[in-house]
Amino acid sequence: MGGALGPALLLTSLFGAWAGLGPGQGEQGMTVAVVFSSSGPPQAQFRARLTPQSFLDLPLEIQPLTVGVNTTNPSSLLTQICGLLGAAHVHGIVFEDNVDTEAVAQILDFISSQTHVPILSISGGSAVVLTPKEPGSAFLQLGVSLEQQLQVLFKVLEEYDWSAFAVITSLHPGHALFLEGVRAVADASHVSWRLLDVVTLELGPGGPRARTQRLLRQLDAPVFVAYCSREEAEVLFAEAAQAGLVGPGHVWLVPNLALGSTDAPPATFPVGLISVVTESWRLSLRQKVRDGVAILALGAHSYWRQHGTLPAPAGDCRVHPGPVSPAREAFYRHLLNVTWEGRDFSFSPGGYLVQPTMVVIALNRHRLWEMVGRWEHGVLYMKYPVWPRYSASLQPVVDSRHLTVATLEERPFVIVESPDPGTGGCVPNTVPCRRQSNHTFSSGDVAPYTKLCCKGFCIDILKKLARVVKFSYDLYLVTNGKHGKRVRGVWNGMIGEVYYKRADMAIGSLTINEERSEIVDFSVPFVETGISVMVARSNGTVSPSAFLEPYSPAVWVMMFVMCLTVVAITVFMFEYFSPVSYNQNLTRGKKSGGPAFTIGKSVWLLWALVFNNSVPIENPRGTTSKIMVLVWAFFAVIFLASYTANLAAFMIQEQYIDTVSGLSDKKFQRPQDQYPPFRFGTVPNGSTERNIRSNYRDMHTHMVKFNQRSVEDALTSLKMGKLDAFIYDAAVLNYMAGKDEGCKLVTIGSGKVFATTGYGIAMQKDSHWKRAIDLALLQFLGDGETQKLETVWLSGICQNEKNEVMSSKLDIDNMAGVFYMLLVAMGLALLVFAWEHLVYWKLRHSVPNSSQLDFLLAFSRGIYSCFSGVQSLASPPRQASPDLTASSAQASVLKMLQAARDMVTTAGVSSSLDRATRTIENWGGGRRAPPPSPCPTPRSGPSPCLPTPDPPPEPSPTGWGPPDGGRAALVRRAPQPPGRPPTPGPPLSDVSRVSRRPAWEARWPVRTGHCGRHLSASERPLSPARCHYSSFPRADRSGRPFLPLFPELEDLPLLGPEQLARREALLHAAWARGSRPRHASLPSSVAEAFARPSSLPAGCTGPACARPDGHSACRRLAQAQSMCLPIYREACQEGEQAGAPAWQHRQHVCLHAHAHLPFCWGAVCPHLPPCASHGSWLSGAWGPLGHRGRTLGLGTGYRDSGGLDEISRVARGTQGFPGPCTWRRISSLESEV
């Protein structure tokens, strides 16, 4: 009875105080009741200081009411709250709920649903048990729900890759919801969670301890997630310690329910226990109450600004509850969106904060709760690893199941990425890893590490090892170096972390070598690697001088400055001193354009041969010069072939890849010998640099200035052309080549490896983990797991085997250099052109005519003669190419003989036809000169051939005559009959008149008659003064006559179709005219022809050649009548009868013009034909008496050439013979022609 009067008197006094405030003031104020769930000293002190002056900074006037409730009796609690609501006009209630006041929270939720009064829980103790709340309840909580706590706990598990765990619960209310939430979060996550076991224990007073021990000993998991109250948690951890589940090798995580108050944790709580609490876990009671009152005041003020009045106070509990009024619903909606002091206090429809800020706390070795992480805006930030070994001092603690692993970022073995910005977690197939940094939380705490996500080949190996060997780990990235190098006696990198026992294990692209093996233990290699070289394909952009790059500048200079000049001078010198070619009389030349082979023509010839240029050139005539030109032509072929073969590699750069045979290749050992110098490097402080420094010191000295900071920098330098080759681990380079965008990077030799080694896991010396890890790695190799991982991580779409040449079009960038050269040449040509005109029109007229400047004229003439050449008067004019189609008779006979040769099958006749064909071709090979005038017989007086004065009398030669002492005259073939009427020609002067006596007259005197009388100069029948175009047959030094050269095919005129069609008609006409003598009527030899009187010419007037029939014409040799070759006398007689002028033009020439068919006036002829005097060659037909027996007439043998050479030289010097003629024996078929 007395117990019930105390609260009643208290409420009565409160209501009296409230009524004394006056109505005027109450209308503008807001009444808030603050209910404390306990009567401890802190609550008593705060209740004494809680006054309206504590809330002056709020927009409304607050009238606080403090109430203390008895939590042991729910009925008394209900009576007190309902009496308060009925006596005072309360707008809202702020309730301090501890974790042990779940019954109070349920009663408050029921009262709110009945009276619609807003109730705000500020400590979060009721958040675990109030799921869901009553319908129509306005109960709001600043704590977090069980689902939100589970979400943070799973993020912690994911942070350290604790994917395997077991769940332990008690029979505390809500344990079924907890298990359901665990399964829901695990199923919704992308992480492959493994729920090893679920155990529900009776942890209350008097529970079966033996059963609890047995169930706990059956658990085999590194991580445990427990759900129970604080009292039950003390019992659970005591039993777990006895079962061996508490210690550094096990991790325990509990929700906020198991912690209770964070002021003094129980002694049974293990070190390293992890839990999740709200950010207000360190706030005082005054700050919590102030936040709750501020939320109610700000919501009411928002309602007042919109509606102009405050909401009505709450109703009485004893009144039957009706529907919620619109004003109450509006006021509740304003409470759901409140911001206070920069914090968002937005509530969900379930009454929980939408974006709560939570912290992860852990019990450190000093048995104090320490914040190790923060959950903010859906992202978890870990301050540093939660394991107690990683306290602020980072002092390591011995642990048999948890390892610290150091690694280093290097693709594809370890790839580091940033967490997902939306969730703050790592994406699938990645592992959280940390790196030292200076990150600062919003609360002002400094995080010494930054959370990152690691993946790659080595990370997958580590995850498999942790699953098989059964250990937990946390991963961090080294920042004090690379793989590991000893610098000034101190090891850095991953090796240094293991050596100085800051890490239990190091995994990554860590090469096994002897120096490292002395201080740490390595596992068996899990990847085979070595040293390889990477180069870049060309991107197709070439320099303007790419067309010059197939040869070095030294080769170009040697080619065009040295070789071309030296060979040109050599060819010129050989030609200069050749006895048959060069005109050495340059200085006396009077006219340019002669056939002289100059130094300029030599350079032009060699230049044309180099570039296969079809330009008009003049070839040398000397044998030695020709050999030199042929050797130069062969050299030019090799030069052009080598240039063309290498040009494509420089014009199409994407097809070019540098190749090296190994580290001992000359490109690495002698890089300065290359053009340009070969540039290569590596990443320092690694095994690759150590290997090169130890074995190739000169190579290492050169590559130091090209070393790169990282692999990514090296790849960029290769693509930009700053580096020619990059030397590094083969496994890394193969991955980079396979994943390169555009496949621009390749490793030489399809991934050829030098200094083969492997990657291993580094552990501390004599580590007990070595054997287990070696067995696991060998198992992975045997099961094919390693090969699968290599396929995933170490292969790419770009393969080194795809090095076939890809054809592509050349664009303007490839050919820019050639166009630039052409433009420069055009510019230089314009400058030379302008200078030429300036000199010709201006400068040369300004130079005064002075004898002092004659040296300039001589110098200019010398340069011009050197490059153009001159022709002296002694040089014979160049002969024109013969025209075989000028005489239709010759063409007809030539075609006839060719057709006859095709029809003849016998070898002898065919050979005769060949010789006859050459004979006909030789007829047209002589120079066509104007014919001599027909001359009368000797009895008719002076010769009317040329109207020139008689030469002065000269002494008669001493002796001259035919070889046998008679009057036989050897003449050449008779001229052809004219094809058209002769045309008069211009008169010519007597060019045969010389002031000195010819040498041949003094050596061989001419005599005639039977008495041996010497003929005077005017009586000589063969005077050289009557024939202006003569020829003399000459022989070589062996006695064989020179054969005339046949015209080249390009000199022959082309026959049209109408001329070719006449072939058959010409053949018929050639053999059908007149009677053809049979072969039996022809003489078998020349001697037989002279033995027959009828074969002698009729021109002889002596008695021995008279005929009974008085026939005046000599009998012609048997030939085709289509030729109709008359003897010279007939031609002369026909010319006189026709009244032709003295000059017969174009058809009848001197006897030497057709000098291939010999005729002879033998010894029986007393007189020679008068016109034979025009053939000056007759003077040399007979030599001295000592040579007469060997002179070739129509007799037996060949003429000795002993005196013919000199006769030929004299004749050329006086008459200017146009060319040599040939004397040879003729066959019967040729004589027939």
From Swiss-Prot:
The modification Phosphoserine is found at residues 875, 881, 912. Glycans are attached at residues 70, 73, 337, 438, 539, 685. Residues 929-956, 975-987 have a biased composition (Pro residues). It is a multi-pass membrane protein. Residues 576-598, 612-626, 837-1233 are cytoplasmic. A motif (PDZ-binding) lies at residues 1231-1233. The chain crosses the membrane at residues 555-575, 627-644, 814-836. InterPro entries: ANF_lig-bd_rcpt, Glu/Gly-bd, Iono_Glu_rcpt_met, Ionotropic_Glu_rcpt, Iontro_rcpt_C, NMDAR2_C, Peripla_BP_I. Residues 920-994 are annotated as: Disordered. Residues 601-620 are annotated as: Pore-forming. GO terms for biological process: brain development; calcium ion transmembrane import into cytosol; directional locomotion; excitatory chemical synaptic transmission; excitatory postsynaptic potential; glutamate receptor signaling pathway; ionotropic glutamate receptor signaling pathway; long-term synaptic potentiation. L-glutamate binds at residues 509, 511, 516, 687-688, 729. Mainly expressed in brain with predominant expression is in the cerebellum, also present in the hippocampus, amygdala, caudate nucleus, corpus callosum, subthalamic nuclei and thalamus. Detected in the heart, skeletal muscle and pancreas. The record marks 612 as: Functional determinant of NMDA receptors. Residues 599-611 dip into the membrane without crossing it. It catalyses: Ca(2+)(in) = Ca(2+)(out); Na(+)(in) = Na(+)(out); K(+)(in) = K(+)(out). It is found in: Cell membrane; Postsynaptic cell membrane. Residues 1-19 form the signal peptide. Keywords: Calcium, Cell membrane, Disulfide bond, Glycoprotein, Ion channel, Ion transport, Ligand-gated ion channel, Magnesium, Membrane, Phosphoprotein, Postsynaptic cell membrane, Receptor, Signal, Synapse, Transmembrane, Transmembrane helix, Transport. The keyword Lipid biosynthesis does not apply. Residues 20-554, 645-813 are extracellular. A hydrophobic region that gives rise to the prediction of a transmembrane span does not cross the membrane, but is part of a discontinuously helical region that dips into the membrane and is probably part of the pore and of the selectivity filter. Component of N-methyl-D-aspartate (NMDA) receptors (NMDARs) that function as heterotetrameric, ligand-gated cation channels with high calcium permeability and voltage-dependent block by Mg(2+). Participates in synaptic plasticity for learning and memory formation by contributing to the slow phase of excitatory postsynaptic current and long-term synaptic potentiation. Channel activation requires binding of the neurotransmitter L-glutamate to the GluN2 subunit, glycine or D-serine binding to the GluN1 subunit, plus membrane depolarization to eliminate channel inhibition by Mg(2+). Heterotetramer. Forms heterotetrameric channels composed of two GluN1/zeta subunits (GRIN1), and two identical GluN2/epsilon subunits (GRIN2A, GRIN2B, GRIN2C or GRIN2D) or GluN3 subunits (GRIN3A or GRIN3B) (in vitro). In vivo, the subunit composition may depend on the expression levels of the different subunits. Interacts with PDZ domains of PATJ and DLG4. Interacts (via PDZ-binding motif) with SNX27 (via PDZ domain); the interaction is required for recycling to the plasma membrane when endocytosed and prevent degradation in lysosomes. Belongs to the glutamate-gated ion channel (TC 1.A.10.1) family. NR2C/GRIN2C subfamily. This is Glutamate receptor ionotropic, NMDA 2C. The gene is GRIN2C.
